[in-house]
Amino acid sequence: MDGENHSVVSEFLFLGLTHSWEIQLLLLVFSSVLYVASITGNILIVFSVTTDPHLHSPMYFLLASLSFIDLGACSVTSPKMIYDLFRKRKVISFGGCIAQIFFIHVVGGVEMVLLIAMAFDRYVALCKPLHYLTIMSPRMCLSFLAVAWTLGVSHSLFQLAFLVNLAFCGPNVLDSFYCDLPRLLRLACTDTYRLQFMVTVNSGFICVGTFFILLISYVFILFTVWKHSSGGSSKALSTLSAHSTVVLLFFGPPMFVYTRPHPNSQMDKFLAIFDAVLTPFLNPVVYTFRNKEMKAAIKRVCKQLVIYKRIS
């Protein structure tokens, strides 16, 4: 009956990050620089791994896959956020909102599985080096990638299944700069308390569960290497430091958002910026630019590009 008294929502209005002109200018510069750096860094990694024979190994295949996903991660919400910074009316269509939610959860799901695959790769390399190439065969790497995409898409469709049949008849204001599923559910015309709980439990359980799987695997790797090598402890710590740093950067913000009992709008926005802009930029820095082989490969790629530009 209430639906007859309201028009169906066809677009959503973002409140954005801040109304301060100075902070908006700072965010514009900060976000634009990091976005361009993220795109450039991750493309360089994918291109280097694809073209350089020295990097045709399971570890770099997984790194390139992660960089490809990070290209999506920084492109789902960042361009729209940058475009809207100085706009008075920040709107997104209903279809655009659904698309944002879909790709956010696909990217998140795929990246979680890839991080588990990379932890397994490091376990085999450190604990079973003689069997590394046998276990981490091309077939195994492709299987990891197929599972990652299957689970990522399945998780996203599962989340959207809660949403597509809901009626939105007003209000249409989201206190954010992107379409966040928990906030969007609160705008539905019907009572969505149970639905919000299920979505939070689903995302929170996946984040926390994957994080603890990775944590346990790292502890097991450290213990195994320390046990079988006199200098194993420091070697393992050095090898796993990059992986654990990226895991903390990736899982920290969503775990904080989905597991705390009392949401805070400003804190959520800060964490969302961190997750959307900073994490995809830091991943290539932490994972690969500290790697001598990767740095050498990127230098070779850059030299080839310079030579090609001069010739053309």
UniProtKB/Swiss-Prot annotation:
Glycans are attached at N5. GO terms for molecular function: G protein-coupled receptor activity; olfactory receptor activity. InterPro entries: GPCR_Rhodpsn, GPCR_Rhodpsn_7TM, Olfact_rcpt, Olfactory_Receptors. Gene3D superfamilies: Rhodopsin 7-helix transmembrane proteins (1.20.1070.10). It is a multi-pass membrane protein. The chain crosses the membrane at residues 26-49, 58-79, 101-120, 140-158, 196-219, 236-258, 270-289. It comes from the Eukaryota. Residues 50-57, 121-139, 220-235, 290-312 are cytoplasmic. GO terms for cellular component: plasma membrane. Keywords: Cell membrane, Disulfide bond, G-protein coupled receptor, Glycoprotein, Membrane, Olfaction, Receptor, Sensory transduction, Transducer, Transmembrane, Transmembrane helix. It is found in: Cell membrane. Residues 1-25, 80-100, 159-195, 259-269 are extracellular. Disulfide bonds join C97-C189. Pfam families: 7tm_4. Belongs to the G-protein coupled receptor 1 family. Odorant receptor. This is Olfactory receptor 4F3/4F16/4F29. It comes from Homo sapiens. The gene is OR4F3.
